[in-house]
């Protein structure tokens, strides 16, 4: 399947651009108000006690600001943040090298933390609980355990699949936050702030239109903003007005609901099943996508907005989906 403009994963070329648009202060971070409020209290209390923050877990679909909010936490705590991802920690020595280089109150951010191997988790447990590394030297009867004290640090775990975390690991996080999709008004404000940083003039209605099609996700909103800016430049316009915005979004294949070709193919597959549950493996084979992409990228927004139901037997289209696609729902008695 071709690259999706509404793909939730970070594209390689976007990394430096995303950093330049990332909010640096709480007042710059739009949305997630309840999470921000709780974090501000925890940070204030930790600073007054002169302690590190409790370990915390952020979970939810990609692109909602887990990394950005972690950078703000580090800045508010006046400490350093080390960013890594679970697939990069292959051996216990990899984790030991990271942990022993942390300073007191530093933050270690591990993305995709659900992908840590059980062996790595075993090394992480005493580090999280007692700020201690237990390193085994040698093997067999001659094996020895060396204990290395670590400075107090904060582990921030980020995951799109909280259900795949082992219970022992999940229980060691003192705080757990579910990142929510953003409202169109929040996304519109994010888009307008980003346009200022990009030195791009944008009309209010253009920002609103991009926000409406951004699937509740800032990462997608910023990606669409930059693509619409390209269309404006080609048309020799210094202003992103509604006409240019609508033309660009339509050319990009993103409809008024933020759906693209993959979303519509997914929903059509369910709707045409006429109430029969469709298994994830069947969907993946039909769409030529891996199951993880369907669960983490395609389904969350559709599920949150009532376009499908997940059951033990599979996925079922809702009446909302049938109405959208104009596919009538057959009487169940006619199916047999």
Curated annotation (Swiss-Prot):
Region (Small ATPAse domain (RuvB-S)): which ranges? Answer: 183-253
* Sections of the chain in a coiled coil: none
Q: What does this protein do?
A: The RuvA-RuvB-RuvC complex processes Holliday junction (HJ) DNA during genetic recombination and DNA repair, while the RuvA-RuvB complex plays an important role in the rescue of blocked DNA replication forks via replication fork reversal (RFR). RuvA specifically binds to HJ cruciform DNA, conferring on it an open structure. The RuvB hexamer acts as an ATP-dependent pump, pulling dsDNA into and through the RuvAB complex. RuvB forms 2 homohexamers on either side of HJ DNA bound by 1 or 2 RuvA tetramers; 4 subunits per hexamer contact DNA at a time.
Question: Where do the segments described as Head domain (RuvB-H) lie?
Answer: 256-336
Keyword DNA damage included in the entry's annotation: yes
* Organism of this sequence: Helicobacter pylori (strain P12)
Which protein, by its recorded name, is this?
Answer: Holliday junction branch migration complex subunit RuvB
> How is the quaternary structure described?
Homohexamer. Forms an RuvA(8)-RuvB(12)-Holliday junction (HJ) complex. HJ DNA is sandwiched between 2 RuvA tetramers; dsDNA enters through RuvA and exits via RuvB. An RuvB hexamer assembles on each DNA strand where it exits the tetramer. Each RuvB hexamer is contacted by two RuvA subunits (via domain III) on 2 adjacent RuvB subunits; this complex drives branch migration. In the full resolvosome a probable DNA-RuvA(4)-RuvB(12)-RuvC(2) complex forms which resolves the HJ.
**Region entry Large ATPase domain (RuvB-L): which residue ranges?**
1-182
State the UniProt keywords alphabetically.
Answer: ATP-binding, Cytoplasm, DNA damage, DNA recombination, DNA repair, DNA-binding, Hydrolase, Nucleotide-binding
The molecular function terms of the Gene Ontology recorded here are:
ATP binding; ATP hydrolysis activity; four-way junction DNA binding; four-way junction helicase activity
Keyword field contains Hydrolase: yes
What are its E.C. numbers?
3.6.4.-
**Reaction(s) catalyzed by this protein?**
ATP + H2O = ADP + phosphate + H(+)
Which EC class, in a word? hydrolase
